[in-house]
């Protein structure tokens, strides 16, 4: 290959400093185009695309003598023949400044190698000027000179900056010598001249070039034809050259270029029409390239692709070649083939064939960048690049910043906190297409309203849609029917026209009467007869006759057929898609539960084919089909990636951004749609996309995020197995991962996770009665999960800790109960069978299950053989499934997300986050309770945990005490851990001496009136005493009677033997048949003071007085009731303006946009609430809202939208759902402004 590219231009040129370089060419001075045009043009060419012409062009002020590109790639400078130095913006490809400082034509211009904004230019009469491109646009700007010269200088033809010192440069020209200038000294500091040893005459040093790394070494070349030589100087001995290269050019040299990547390579070109490659260190000629048709006045290496070089000649060609342009076997074969062609073929093609002359190679020398490769392998993974040094003795590890490979911190935090609002706001501010914006708006609605509310609004009829809704007039019709019924009167005769029908009616043979009526087309009469018949076949026959006659022509009859026969599929498949909401209504009303989802999906497919893409997605969501939504998004992914290419520098960046956006979108959707269910990815294309994202996350070093997604991919997929093993090894978690690790599911089910293939099993020690690190993640369901009060083996001494276990909590927290959704606070204390000296260790998610041999898995609150009345059961009969991205939350995160992160809107997923240990529900609903009959006294069971902890107590158990006729309202022994503060945070309780119960003695006599111990305050959320037979199951339920534990001796082991039953103490009858509500504000404000310990003496004694026990002191003081905050007047202006603007646009908005208007109003109210409470928005955000208000007043809607984007980008934690309301108000205001 002779050349890579050839551009038909007589022009000087400059390379861009890019890995894939661009060549800029400027029309050369003193030349005439083929069309005799005098226009000077700066053109940009991409290497390899010469056939398609230049990629851009700029008209210059005059033709070019020289052209140079700044090292940062931002600016080009042209030395023009009219004395002007013109500067061009490379990115925008336009002229930015023209400064005429030279008195005659500018001969040379060069940018500084260290400071990209500094340049130097030279011309005739010794004019040299230094430029600062940061100031060239200022009015009256003028460059400055370098200082005083040693001797007078004539024309400056060549300039070069020192590659190490930014203040030193060299010049050469027609004066016969070269000068070294120091801008700090402001003068010429060194004078170079050369006298030929052959002629004794001084040679003209016309060209100068600096060494790429040595600041004291410079090369010069002579421009005369008598003795063309290249001289290499060491400035420490400026009297004589270090090297002389003379056996090369036959005429004067016009250009030099010293390779920046290899100091042993130098290019030269001259008046002998040739380019030569030299080794200046050894003064040896390496390669002489083919002769050109005219002078080669410039040659240069590409700065970042040194394998390429370009040469410009006056033969109207700029050639781009490679250093590896050497003769090979293909060239020899082509030459042999040409020698065999006929004379006629030769003469026919001779005018069109190009010269295939090859370079003459004197010595083959590999460039330095080919010989510096490490003898060992290089590899990159986890965001790091590992290199073995060239000497093989060291290792270099670096973490480069690559666009698109940054850690996705926002997604990682969202998965931990379940708050996806920041991601939604970010994507809404950076939407790519209108369809993409609709998807993220859908997700925002889901985050704010929840799935059910969103679907209800999306599937409901708009205000402008015709839906006739008649008021219910059943009662009025009843009275009308009473007075308006038909009452026969007068004589009449039987119908003589239809005697058969009449006769069969009189005989009661209704079937025959119907047949005769249908034969005579008496359809109405047939319907009346069928209504009086109990035979369904007769009714069906008449209906079929009606449908046959009218259904093909009557739309009402067709609808009656579909509804009457329950053929909803006919509506789904055949009704016009414009009436799809009516079809949805029919599906919801008449379809079976098993078929609803499939029918919604079928209707969604029809809408998608009809082009109603967003409505189809809504129906897929209603039909619980994430796979369908994923297929739609996957089909649109290539188009989205293509759209992103215009905003990214490379195709790879666009691909990674499109992939990340898709994964975020699907993850957010799955989190909101599968809030109560589980989802495993099964779609192969979807799995492949998530695997690609996992690989990208691993490449950036985000192994935790990669593992979260891998948990939700099918485990039987070989690629998933391989990727998971690779991530585990890279993250350092594989060394202690067992082959089969047991972990407790979200609802208490024990699941066995497959380990990494080939890794040894390392069972972890099991520590009894230790709480999980995350109590919300390890709740136990009510369908038979193992109990926690189980005898556990002692941990081995000096056991090796689990490096991946979460850190132990700062306080002792209760274990979940085996039954019930809420955890009884009694389990806060250790089990009675806990051995003394048990080491408190964090919950180990990899520990084997405790329900093996010898383990007890029954309820820790009731004997196994007793089924208490009112025992809460799982209403669905199956364990609740985990949702798509929450399966990995079973294991406590290594770095839990902060709980006090601000957010503009509480995420919908947190609605049920209060089901955790000792947490109050977010919304306390008053439950209706029926009147309770007088019940028997509760069974006082002492030390229940001790009973069930022993595996020997299975068959024979101590019976309960006899039932008495006296009902008791006596308080059962309360839990030693009572709620101290109504908070969503887990309670941290400290027990005081005031209400500390005494240690339990299973052999002590029954408690009497004298030695009865005062119980701590009962929990207000415990069931009333009337539910005597039901064991406590709620979080705040008290212990059973007599089960009091000394908090000061938690580790004291107690006997495994159960205590004898104690007689229940009777009490007065219940005060009320209805359960007292506990949801009033007064109750909530003083939750710890609602109940008191009430005990009664044995039978026969007087009833004891009620003793009110002071509430326990809490670690966290109760929060005072928030008082109204005064809104600053400046912020009140924001509320007033938005309300006024919303009121202005409301009557102007078309009816079809009423939903958007309502949504805008709802979101703005969220903003108003935050301003009124002063609880979210920071001062910068408030200031930007003021800016939006000011811009809207001036009708600058695009500027206001830009401020909105700024808030969404830089204030993510504050930009909640209200921000979309501001955006929509801006759009509505702009649309209605004219």
Curated annotation (Swiss-Prot):
Disulfide bonds: none annotated. One of its GO terms (molecular function) is structural molecule activity. It is a peripheral membrane protein. GO terms for biological process: COPII-coated vesicle cargo loading; endoplasmic reticulum organization; positive regulation of ER to Golgi vesicle-mediated transport; positive regulation of protein exit from endoplasmic reticulum; protein transport. It is found in: Cytoplasmic vesicle, COPII-coated vesicle membrane; Endoplasmic reticulum membrane. It holds the Pfam family TPR_Sec16. Residues 822-870, 1053-1115 are annotated as: Disordered. The keyword Endoplasmic reticulum applies. Its main location: membrane. The keyword Membrane applies. PANTHER family: SEC31-RELATED PROTEIN, SECRETORY 31, ISOFORM D. The COPII coat is composed of at least 5 proteins: the SEC23/24 complex, the SEC13/31 complex, and the protein SAR1. SEC13 and SEC31 make a 2:2 tetramer that forms the edge element of the COPII outer coat. The tetramer self-assembles in multiple copies to form the complete polyhedral cage. Interacts (via WD 8) with SEC13. Component of the coat protein complex II (COPII) which promotes the formation of transport vesicles from the endoplasmic reticulum (ER). The coat has two main functions, the physical deformation of the endoplasmic reticulum membrane into vesicles and the selection of cargo molecules. This is Protein transport protein SEC31. It comes from Eremothecium gossypii (strain ATCC 10895 / CBS 109.51 / FGSC 9923 / NRRL Y-1056) (Yeast). The lineage of its organism: Eukaryota, Fungi, Dikarya, Ascomycota, Saccharomycotina.
């Amino acid at each position: 290959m002779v050349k890579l590219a050839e551009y038909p231009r007589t022009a000087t040129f400059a390379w861009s400093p890019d890995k894939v370089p661009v060549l800029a060419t400027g029309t050369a001075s003193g030349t005439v185009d083929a069309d005799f045009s005098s226009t000077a043009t700066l053109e940009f060419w991409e290497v390899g695309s010469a056939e398609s012409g230049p990629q851009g062009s700029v008209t210059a002020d005059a033709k070019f003598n020289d052209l140079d590109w700044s090292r940062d790639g931002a600016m080009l400078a042209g030395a023009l023949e009219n004395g002007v130095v013109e500067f061009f913006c490379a990115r925008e490809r336009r002229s930015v400044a023209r400064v005429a400082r030279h008195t005659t034509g500018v001969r040379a211009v060069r940018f500084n190698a260290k400071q990209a904004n500094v340049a130097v230019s030279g011309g005739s009469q010794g004019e040299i000027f230094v430029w600062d491109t940061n100031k060239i646009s200022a009015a009256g700007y003028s460059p400055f000179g370098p200082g005083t010269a040693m001797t007078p200088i004539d024309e400056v033809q060549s300039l070069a900056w020192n590659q190490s010192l930014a203040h030193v440069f060299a010049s050469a020209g027609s004066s016969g010598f070269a000068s070294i200038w120091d801008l700090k000294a402001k003068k010429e500091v060194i004078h170079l001249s050369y006298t030929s040893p052959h002629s004794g005459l001084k040679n003209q040093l016309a060209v100068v070039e600096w060494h790429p790394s040595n600041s004291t070494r410079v090369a010069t070349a002579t421009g005369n034809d008598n003795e063309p030589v290249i001289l290499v100087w060491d400035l420490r001995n400026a009297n004589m050259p270090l090297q002389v290269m003379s056996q090369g050019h036959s005429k004067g040299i016009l250009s030099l270029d010293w390779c920046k990547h290899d100091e042993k390579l130098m290019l030269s070109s001259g008046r002998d029409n040739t380019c030569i490659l030299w080794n200046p260190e050894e003064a040896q000629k390496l390669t002489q390239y083919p002769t050109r048709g005219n002078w080669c006045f410039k040659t240069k290496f590409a700065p970042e692709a040194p394998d390429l070089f370009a040469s410009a000649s006056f033969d109207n060609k700029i050639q781009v070649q490679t250093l590896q342009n050497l003769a090979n076997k293909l060239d020899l074969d082509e030459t042999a083939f040409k020698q065999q062609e006929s004379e006629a073929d030769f003469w026919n093609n001779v005018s069109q064939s190009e010269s295939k002359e090859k370079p003459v190679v004197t010595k083959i020398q590999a460039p330095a960048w080919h010989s510096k490769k490490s003898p060992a392998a290089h590899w990159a993974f986890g965001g790091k690049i590992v290199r073995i040094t060239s000497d093989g003795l060291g290792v270099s590890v670096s973490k480069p910043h690559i666009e698109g490979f940054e850690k996705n911190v926002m997604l990682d935090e969202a998965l931990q906190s379940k708050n996806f609002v920041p991601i939604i706001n970010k994507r809404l501010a950076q939407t790519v297409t209108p369809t993409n914006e609709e998807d993220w708006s859908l997700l925002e609605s889901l985050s704010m309203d929840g799935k059910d509310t969103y679907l209800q609004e999306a599937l409901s009829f708009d205000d402008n849609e015709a839906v006739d809704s008649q008021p219910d007039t059943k009662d009025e019709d009843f009275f009308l029917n009473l007075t308006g019924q038909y009452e026969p009167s007068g004589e009449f005769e039987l119908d003589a026209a239809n005697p058969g029908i009449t006769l069969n009616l009189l005989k009661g043979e209704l079937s025959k009467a119907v047949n005769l009526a249908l034969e005579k087309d008496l359809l109405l009469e047939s319907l009346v007869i069928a209504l009086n018949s109990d035979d369904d076949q007769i009714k069906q026959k008449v209906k079929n006759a009606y449908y046959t006659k009218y259904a093909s022509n009557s739309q009402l009859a067709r609808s009656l057929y579909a509804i009457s026969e329950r053929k909803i599929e006919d509506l789904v498949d055949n009704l016009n898609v414009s009436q799809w909401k009516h079809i949805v209504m029919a599906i919801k009303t008449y379809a079976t539960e098993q078929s609803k989802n499939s029918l919604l999906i079928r209707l969604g497919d029809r809408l998608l084919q009809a082009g109603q893409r967003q409505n189809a997605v809504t129906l897929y969501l209603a039909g619980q089909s994430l796979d369908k939504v994923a297929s739609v998004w996957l089909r649109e992914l290539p188009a989205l990636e293509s759209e992103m290419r215009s905003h990214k520098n490379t195709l790879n960046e666009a691909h990674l951004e499109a992939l990340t956006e898709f994964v975020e979108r699907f993850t957010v959707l799955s989190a909101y749609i599968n809030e109560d269910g589980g989802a495993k990815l099964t779609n192969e294309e979807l799995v492949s996309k998530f695997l690609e994202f996992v690989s990208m996350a691993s490449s950036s070093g985000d192994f935790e995020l990669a593992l979260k997604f891998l948990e939700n991919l099918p485990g039987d997929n070989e690629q998933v197995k391989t990727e998971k093993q690779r991530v585990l090894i890279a993250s350092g978690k594989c060394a202690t991962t067992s082959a089969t690790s047991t972990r407790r599911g979200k609802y208490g089910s024990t699941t066995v996770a497959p380990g990494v293939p080939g890794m040894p099993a390392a069972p972890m020690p099991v520590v009894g009665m230790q709480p999980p690190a995350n109590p919300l993640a390890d709740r136990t369901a009510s369908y038979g999960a193992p109990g926690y009060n189980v005898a556990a083996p002692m941990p081995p001494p000096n056991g090796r800790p689990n490096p991946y276990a979460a850190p132990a909590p700062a306080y002792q927290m209760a274990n979940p109960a085996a039954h019930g959704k809420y955890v009884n606070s009694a389990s806060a204390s250790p089990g009675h069978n806990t051995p003394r000296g048990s080491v408190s260790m964090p919950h180990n998610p990899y520990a084997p299950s405790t329900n093996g041999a010898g383990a007890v898995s029954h309820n820790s609150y009731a004997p196994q053989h007793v089924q208490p009345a009112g025992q809460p059961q799982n209403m669905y009969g199956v364990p609740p499934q985990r949702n798509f991205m929450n399966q990995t939350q079973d294991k406590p995160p290594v770095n839990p997300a902060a709980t006090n992160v601000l957010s503009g809107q509480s995420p919908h997923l947190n609605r049920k986050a209060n089901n955790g240990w000792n947490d109050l529900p977010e919304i306390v609903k008053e439950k209706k309770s029926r009147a309770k009959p007088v019940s028997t006294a509760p069974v006082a069971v002492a030390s229940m945990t001790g009973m069930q902890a022993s595996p020997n107590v299975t068959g024979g158990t101590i019976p309960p005490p006899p039932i008495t006729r006296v009902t008791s309202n006596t308080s059962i022994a309360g839990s030693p851990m009572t709620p101290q503060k109504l908070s969503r945070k887990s309670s941290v309780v400290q027990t005081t001496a005031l209400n500390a119960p005494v240690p339990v003695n299973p052999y002590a006599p029954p408690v009497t009136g004298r030695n009865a111990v005062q119980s701590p305050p009962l929990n207000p959320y415990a069931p009333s005493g009337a539910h005597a037979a039901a064991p406590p199951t709620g979080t705040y339920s008290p212990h059973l009677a007599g089960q009091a534990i000394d908090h000061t001796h938690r580790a004291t082991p107690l006997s495994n033997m159960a205590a004898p039953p104690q007689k229940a103490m009777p009490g007065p009858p219940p005060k009320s048949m209805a359960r007292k509500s506990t949801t009033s504000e007064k109750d909530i404000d003083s939750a710890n003071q609602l109940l008191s310990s009430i005990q009664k003496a044995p039978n026969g004694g007087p009833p004891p007085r009620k003793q009110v026990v002071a509430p326990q002191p809490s670690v966290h003081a109760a929060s005072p009731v928030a008082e109204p905050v005064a809104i600053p007047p400046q912020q009140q202006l924001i509320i007033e303006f938005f309300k006024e603007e919303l009121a202005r646009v409301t009557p102007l908005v078309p009816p079809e946009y009423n939903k958007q208007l309502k949504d805008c109003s709802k979101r703005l109210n969220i903003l108003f609430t935050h301003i009124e409470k002063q609880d979210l928005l920071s001062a910068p955000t408030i200031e930007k809202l003021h800016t939006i208000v000011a811009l809207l007043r001036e009708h600058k809607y695009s500027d206001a939208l830009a401020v909105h984007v700024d808030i969404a980008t830089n204030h993510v934690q504050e930009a909640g759902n209200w921000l979309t309301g501001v955006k929509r108000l801006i759009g509505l205001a702009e649309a209605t402004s004219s």
